[in-house]
Each structure stands twice: as structure tokens, then as C-alpha cells.
């Protein structure tokens, strides 16, 4: 993802290019974990920078363009270029909220919460999640209807298919750190 990785990261990834099929055969997922660790590091760096940017008011009077889809663009080559990209992204996010009639304090609150939530989700991913993502990426190249279920997902699937789930009968939603009851299930 060109919002996280830089050109200098590509040689690091290339050393694993010919090993990915070996990972599938051997079950040694260390190369995948190495790649994920770099992703987690880059996400932490960029999102920390984005949150820190909110300490200062953003100038909406500049005439700049933000390109979210960067697939056709070259990889950024330096931390400074990555910070510039994130400045543009945060400015774009803040501008969208401003256009939705949020005041500056509201913008800070929403964006801080958003960026921290992304970081929290990335940091909550465990080795099973990383393996599941990798294996699903592989299986979908062969068949879009095939997927790998991690042990946790497999257990949830078994419960759903057996219709034997026993619990409090409520549909729950995680809202920030609080659990909210959406509805009671008869």
C-alpha cells in the first residue's frame, strides 16, 4: 500500500518474492510475519504523524490535490515525502469533515478517534490473523469463493452452522471501548 510503504521497503519485500510458495509448502510463516511487522511499524509511524498534525490548525486555502488511489504512482522515496502525503491525507479528511459542518474541535475529535482506531485494530492483529490474511490472499487467486478459516473463525463457523450457540441472546456492537446492545434476539 503506497500510503504506508516507501520505495526503500521494496527491496526488503523482494527478498521474499521467491519464498512465498515455500511458505505454503513448509508452513513456516516467518517471512509473512516479517512483512507484517514492517507494515505495523509503517502504520504506527504514519498514523502517529497524522495524529500529531491535528495539534495545529490546517490551512484549507491552499490549492492542492490529494490522490487517494496511488496504484499508478511511483513509490515515495523518503520519510519526508511520506509525511507530505499524510499531510495531504489529513487535510483531505479534515476538509471533508469541515464540509459536513464539523467545527475544528469536532474535526480533531473525529480524526484522532479514527486514526487511533486504525492503529488499535492493526495492533490487535495476532499471528492467526496474519496467516489467515496471507492464506486468503492466496486462495482467492485460485478461486474467489474459497477461503481459509483461522481456528477462531472455524469455531465461529461451526457454531453458526450447528445452530447450537448458547448465550445471552443479544446483538452487540463495539463502539470505541464500550459495548452497546443493538437488539435482543429471541
Outline where the language-model segments fall.
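Flexible, low-complexity junctional segments that flank or bridge functional domains
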Residues: 1-186
Amino acid at each position: 500500500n503506497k500510503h504506508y510503504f516507501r520505495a526503500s521497503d521494496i527491496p526488503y519485500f523482494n527478498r521474499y518474492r521467491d519464498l512465498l510458495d515455500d511458505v505454503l509448502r513448509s508452513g513456516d510463516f516467518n517471512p509473512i510475519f516479517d512483512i507484517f511487522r514492517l507494515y505495523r511499524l509503517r502504520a504506527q509511524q504514519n498514523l502517529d504523524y497524522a495524529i500529531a498534525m491535528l495539534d495545529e490548525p490546517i490551512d484549507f486555502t491552499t490549492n492542492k490535490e490529494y490522490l487517494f488511489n496511488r496504484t499508478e504512482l511511483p513509490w515515495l522515496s523518503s520519510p519526508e515525502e511520506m509525511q507530505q502525503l499524510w499531510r495531504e491525507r489529513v487535510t483531505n479528511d479534515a476538509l471533508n469533515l469541515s464540509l459536513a459542518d464539523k467545527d475544528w474541535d469536532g474535526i480533531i475529535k473525529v480524526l484522532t478517534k479514527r486514526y487511533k482506531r486504525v492503529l488499535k485494530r492493526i495492533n490487535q492483529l495476532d499471528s492467526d490473523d496474519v496467516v489467515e490474511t496471507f492464506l486468503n490472499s492466496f486462495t482467492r487467486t485460485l478461486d474467489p469463493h474459497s477461503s481459509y478459516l483461522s481456528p477462531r473463525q472455524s469455531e465461529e463457523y461451526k457454531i453458526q452452522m450447528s445452530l447450537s450457540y448458547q448465550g445471552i441472546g443479544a446483538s452487540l456492537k463495539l463502539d470505541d471501548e464500550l459495548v452497546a446492545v443493538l437488539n435482543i434476539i429471541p
